[in-house]
Design a protein with these regions (language model features):
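Active-site neighborhood of HAD-like aspartate-dependent phosphohydrolases
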Residues: 1-47
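Short histidine/acidic/glycine/proline-rich micro-motifs that form metal-
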Residues: 14-16, 54-55, 125-129
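A generic "structured core" feature
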Residues: 14-16, 97-101, 107, 139-148
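Short, surface-exposed alpha-helical segments at coil->helix boundaries
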Residues: 24, 28, 66, 131-136
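Helix N-cap/coil-helix junction residues
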Residues: 39, 78, 143-144
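A metal-dependent, Asp-based hydrolase signature
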Residues: 42-92
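Short, acidic loop-to-helix structural element flanking the phosphoryl-transfer center
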Residues: 62-67, 79-84, 91-123, 135
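Substrate-recognition "cap/lid" segment bordering the active-site pocket of phosphatases
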Residues: 122-148
Length: 148
Protein backbone atom coordinates (compact mmCIF):
# COMPACT_ATOMS: atom_id res chain seq x y z
CA UNK A 1 0.00 0.00 0.00
CA UNK A 2 1.50 3.33 -1.02
CA UNK A 3 0.96 6.69 0.62
CA UNK A 4 -1.11 8.97 -1.60
CA UNK A 5 -1.99 11.74 0.85
CA UNK A 6 0.01 13.53 3.54
CA UNK A 7 -1.84 15.38 6.30
CA UNK A 8 -0.12 18.34 7.99
CA UNK A 9 -1.24 19.98 11.21
CA UNK A 10 -1.03 23.77 11.11
CA UNK A 11 -0.83 24.93 14.71
CA UNK A 12 2.34 23.75 16.40
CA UNK A 13 3.66 21.87 13.37
CA UNK A 14 3.73 23.98 10.21
CA UNK A 15 3.29 27.09 12.35
CA UNK A 16 5.38 26.79 15.52
CA UNK A 17 3.54 28.21 18.53
CA UNK A 18 2.42 27.49 22.06
CA UNK A 19 -1.19 26.67 21.26
CA UNK A 20 -2.54 27.29 24.76
CA UNK A 21 -0.90 30.72 24.93
CA UNK A 22 -1.99 31.57 21.40
CA UNK A 23 -5.65 30.73 22.09
CA UNK A 24 -5.58 32.75 25.32
CA UNK A 25 -4.12 35.76 23.47
CA UNK A 26 -6.55 35.31 20.58
CA UNK A 27 -9.60 35.42 22.84
CA UNK A 28 -8.08 38.28 24.86
CA UNK A 29 -7.46 40.41 21.75
CA UNK A 30 -10.88 39.66 20.28
CA UNK A 31 -12.64 40.42 23.59
CA UNK A 32 -10.74 43.71 23.97
CA UNK A 33 -11.65 44.71 20.42
CA UNK A 34 -15.35 43.95 20.94
CA UNK A 35 -15.68 45.45 24.45
CA UNK A 36 -16.33 49.02 23.23
CA UNK A 37 -19.16 47.61 21.10
CA UNK A 38 -21.09 46.21 24.06
CA UNK A 39 -19.48 42.80 24.44
CA UNK A 40 -18.59 42.30 28.10
CA UNK A 41 -15.17 40.59 28.04
CA UNK A 42 -15.97 38.08 30.79
CA UNK A 43 -19.29 37.08 29.25
CA UNK A 44 -17.66 37.08 25.82
CA UNK A 45 -15.06 34.56 26.97
CA UNK A 46 -17.82 32.31 28.37
CA UNK A 47 -19.71 32.61 25.09
CA UNK A 48 -16.63 31.68 23.05
CA UNK A 49 -15.95 28.61 25.16
CA UNK A 50 -19.62 27.60 24.99
CA UNK A 51 -19.53 27.93 21.20
CA UNK A 52 -16.32 25.92 20.96
CA UNK A 53 -17.78 23.23 23.23
CA UNK A 54 -20.87 23.07 21.01
CA UNK A 55 -18.61 22.55 17.97
CA UNK A 56 -16.69 19.74 19.67
CA UNK A 57 -19.99 18.07 20.55
CA UNK A 58 -21.40 18.57 17.05
CA UNK A 59 -22.72 15.25 15.80
CA UNK A 60 -22.72 16.40 12.20
CA UNK A 61 -26.23 17.85 12.33
CA UNK A 62 -24.91 21.14 10.98
CA UNK A 63 -21.70 22.91 10.02
CA UNK A 64 -19.43 23.85 12.92
CA UNK A 65 -19.82 27.53 12.09
CA UNK A 66 -23.61 27.33 12.40
CA UNK A 67 -23.37 25.35 15.64
CA UNK A 68 -20.94 27.90 17.08
CA UNK A 69 -23.10 30.94 16.23
CA UNK A 70 -26.25 29.26 17.50
CA UNK A 71 -24.63 28.78 20.92
CA UNK A 72 -22.79 32.13 20.94
CA UNK A 73 -26.04 33.95 20.13
CA UNK A 74 -27.57 32.76 23.40
CA UNK A 75 -25.11 35.12 25.10
CA UNK A 76 -25.10 37.92 22.52
CA UNK A 77 -28.25 37.85 20.34
CA UNK A 78 -27.00 40.86 18.35
CA UNK A 79 -23.83 39.10 17.20
CA UNK A 80 -25.20 37.84 13.89
CA UNK A 81 -26.27 41.35 12.93
CA UNK A 82 -22.85 42.67 13.91
CA UNK A 83 -20.71 40.29 11.88
CA UNK A 84 -18.99 43.34 10.37
CA UNK A 85 -17.25 43.82 13.74
CA UNK A 86 -15.84 40.31 13.64
CA UNK A 87 -14.88 40.74 9.98
CA UNK A 88 -13.05 43.97 10.84
CA UNK A 89 -11.17 42.26 13.66
CA UNK A 90 -9.89 39.55 11.33
CA UNK A 91 -9.12 42.00 8.52
CA UNK A 92 -7.34 44.62 10.62
CA UNK A 93 -6.35 43.27 14.04
CA UNK A 94 -5.88 39.49 13.96
CA UNK A 95 -2.43 39.95 12.42
CA UNK A 96 -1.14 41.24 15.79
CA UNK A 97 -1.30 37.64 16.99
CA UNK A 98 1.49 36.68 14.61
CA UNK A 99 3.81 37.90 17.38
CA UNK A 100 2.89 34.74 19.32
CA UNK A 101 4.03 32.46 16.47
CA UNK A 102 7.26 31.71 14.71
CA UNK A 103 8.06 30.48 11.22
CA UNK A 104 10.00 27.37 10.27
CA UNK A 105 11.31 27.97 6.72
CA UNK A 106 11.99 24.24 6.31
CA UNK A 107 8.24 23.65 6.10
CA UNK A 108 8.05 25.37 2.69
CA UNK A 109 10.64 22.94 1.31
CA UNK A 110 8.90 19.97 2.92
CA UNK A 111 5.51 20.85 1.41
CA UNK A 112 7.15 21.32 -2.00
CA UNK A 113 8.88 17.92 -1.80
CA UNK A 114 5.66 16.14 -0.86
CA UNK A 115 3.77 17.80 -3.72
CA UNK A 116 6.59 17.05 -6.19
CA UNK A 117 6.33 13.38 -5.20
CA UNK A 118 2.78 13.37 -6.56
CA UNK A 119 1.11 13.07 -3.18
CA UNK A 120 -1.88 15.12 -2.12
CA UNK A 121 -1.20 17.59 0.69
CA UNK A 122 -4.01 18.19 3.19
CA UNK A 123 -4.12 20.73 6.02
CA UNK A 124 -5.62 19.94 9.42
CA UNK A 125 -6.34 22.70 11.89
CA UNK A 126 -8.44 23.75 14.83
CA UNK A 127 -12.11 24.48 13.98
CA UNK A 128 -12.11 27.40 16.43
CA UNK A 129 -10.89 29.72 13.69
CA UNK A 130 -12.89 31.14 10.78
CA UNK A 131 -11.47 30.61 7.30
CA UNK A 132 -9.85 34.05 7.12
CA UNK A 133 -7.91 33.40 10.35
CA UNK A 134 -6.76 30.03 9.04
CA UNK A 135 -5.59 31.59 5.78
CA UNK A 136 -3.62 34.24 7.68
CA UNK A 137 -1.98 31.62 9.89
CA UNK A 138 -1.02 29.61 6.80
CA UNK A 139 0.75 32.72 5.46
CA UNK A 140 2.48 33.28 8.81
CA UNK A 141 3.94 29.80 8.33
CA UNK A 142 5.47 30.95 5.03
CA UNK A 143 2.93 29.04 2.95
CA UNK A 144 -0.15 29.92 0.91
CA UNK A 145 -3.67 28.46 1.15
CA UNK A 146 -3.30 27.08 -2.39
CA UNK A 147 -0.63 24.69 -1.08
CA UNK A 148 -3.46 22.58 0.33
Amino acid sequence: MSVTTVLFDLDGTLLPLNQDEFVIQYFKHLAAYLAPHGYDPELFTKAIYAGVRAMTENDGRDYNEAVFWEEFSHFFPQAREEMHLFDDFYANHFSKLQAFCSCNPRMRALIDRVKESGRTVVLATNPVFPATATEQRIRWAGLVPEDF
